[in-house]
């Protein structure tokens, strides 16, 4: 009798997208849950990013943009405000006098500027009625507002994901049939652990995976505690180190390094293996590219298309310190492109059959996926 195998499954946002969940950054940005009108310099910066191609923005792009924003600050110890001194003086008068009598009519250019920046809001017409919803936060320091803005992004994203959360129905998707295959593999006696970098639940209608442990690397929206930030190997002024993932009070990621080391098989679905999560994967892939002490592991990576496949290989090249050939020679990793299954159908078939899927049913699955 064969010994049970240890299988580690790593999920990224591509997994949720393959299940047809609207979990792109663009989906969140276009929703009412995104705090894009909050008067913080950070929000103003993010609103200017990717105006023509938000549909292509990945979550790691957002995390990288947090770093770009920090690097754009002339003096991080003071921050950089979007509100000018004249606008601040006008806001202070609003605080003192309100909008009565339209005293600000000779400063409408400043009023319009503040409206455009999301600091003041219209409350109907005419323009003389602006100011009724003065945002008191606007008078606080830009650093204070940026820190609150990041918290609002997390809160808004949690609420957005809860609003779209529902059991996944039986579907024709590679992600769905991966879950079915994992369920059958666990029932056959192998040990499986799922490590997800998503904030969503791993569940699907009519099929329970309760016996498979699921570890959320960066929190989950059910608990209302999620981690968004840039990588923690950077030097930042203490005023802005709240942008680092590791500085979040909720940051207690489970150990993934040891399970990867002990695994017989590693399955990755929809994760870019990008720079911001490099610390989790680099030790594993560097070890698997060691010709002096070769230990083969089964590695299967599900990604979307040719472009994402190239990005994956570039990430692996970097994590193995240029030993991509050694990684391939020792382990023979398999990359399956979910949007190119016509070309990769044999790879998908072999994967399903190797994970306790009936051969006839595996053929049916491939047929449905190719429709």
Model-derived regions, located:
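Glycine-rich loops and low-complexity Gly/Arg-rich segments
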Residues: 33-36, 219-222, 238-243, 291-294, ...
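Conserved beta-strand -> loop -> alpha-helix junction used to position metal-binding or nucleic-acid-contacting
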Residues: 11, 27-30, 215, 219-220
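Extended, H/D-rich, highly charged conserved domains that either
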Residues: 39-254, 259-262
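Active-site catalytic pocket residues across diverse enzymes, especially alpha/beta-hydrolases
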Residues: 32, 207-210, 288-291
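SIR2/sirtuin-family catalytic core signature
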Residues: 1-28, 255-371
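Short catalytic helix/loop segments, enriched in acidic residues and glycine
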Residues: 25-47
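Intrinsically disordered, low-complexity regions enriched in small/polar residues
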Residues: 17, 27-30, 62, 71-72, ...
